[in-house]
């Protein structure tokens, strides 16, 4: 006999002490907190290298907020997908539970539906949090109420369509983040180019001395660096999430 599958003890979010989402849905507060920790940890690792090229791109004054937002959104997306993967692994464990009688003469009917439902209750602690068992329990309950076996297939189909729509909607946040990441990069591009153009205009106005021109050109190149670096960061982050 297989061991009871306890959602309250096996769900990754429940283990941490947060309210777990149903099926493969995630707790966005928890995933956001984990993403914030990852972002802070990444900047902590890069801080000693802020004077090098790889560190400068993340600590540049003009693009620091955008770089942090890009990294946070990327981390949030990865944490959500990782949590969903762990939850999917838990859902797959329901396939190992034996709920169908081994008797070859068993026939599903309103009278025998109760025995299957009882096995489900012994297989897991709460069928509502397991997609497979929730779907079966819902169909069996309708079978006992309606008394028509022929309606079970239609009930399964309706419930499957509902579950599919629910799963698709659970990816809306990830889709929004994937969309927002490169947009942030392009916003950084616009800000960087605006800074560079403004500095270049200042250079033209003070073009009387070469030393002043050189000093002002540093601001121009800094703005251009911000423009291209944030675009690169946004595109690379979106690519990592898509992979």
Model-flagged regions — what are they?
Residues 2-167:
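Large intracellular
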Residues 51, 55, 167-243:
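Helix-termination/interfacial motifs at the ends of transmembrane alpha-helices
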């Amino acid at each position: 006999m297989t061991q009871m599958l306890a959602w309250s003890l096996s769900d990754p979010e429940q283990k941490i002490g947060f309210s777990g989402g149903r099926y493969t849905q995630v707790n966005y507060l928890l995933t956001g907190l984990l993403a914030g920790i990852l972002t802070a940890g990444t900047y902590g690792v890069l801080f000693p290298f802020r004077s090098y090229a790889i560190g400068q791109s993340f600590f540049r004054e003009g693009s620091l907020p955008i770089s942090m937002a890009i990294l946070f959104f990327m981390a949030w997306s990865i944490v959500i997908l990782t949590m969903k993967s762990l939850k999917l692994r838990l859902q797959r464990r329901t396939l190992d539970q034996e709920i169908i009688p081994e008797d070859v003469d068993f026939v599903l009917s309103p009278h025998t539906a109760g025995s299957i439902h009882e096995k489900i209750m012994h297989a897991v602690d709460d069928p509502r949090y397991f997609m497979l068992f929730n779907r079966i329990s819902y169909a069996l309950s309708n079978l006992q109420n309606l008394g028509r076996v022929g309606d079970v297939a239609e009930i399964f189909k309706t419930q499957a369509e509902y579950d599919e729509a629910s799963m698709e909607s659970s990816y809306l946040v990830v889709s929004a983040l994937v969309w927002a990441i490169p947009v942030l990069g392009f916003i950084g591009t616009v800000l960087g180019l605006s800074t560079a153009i403004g500095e270049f205009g200042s250079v033209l106005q003070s073009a009387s001395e070469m030393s002043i021109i050189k000093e002002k050109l540093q601001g121009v190149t800094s703005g251009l660096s911000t423009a291209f670096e944030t675009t690169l960061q946004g595109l690379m982050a979106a690519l990592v999430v898509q992979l």
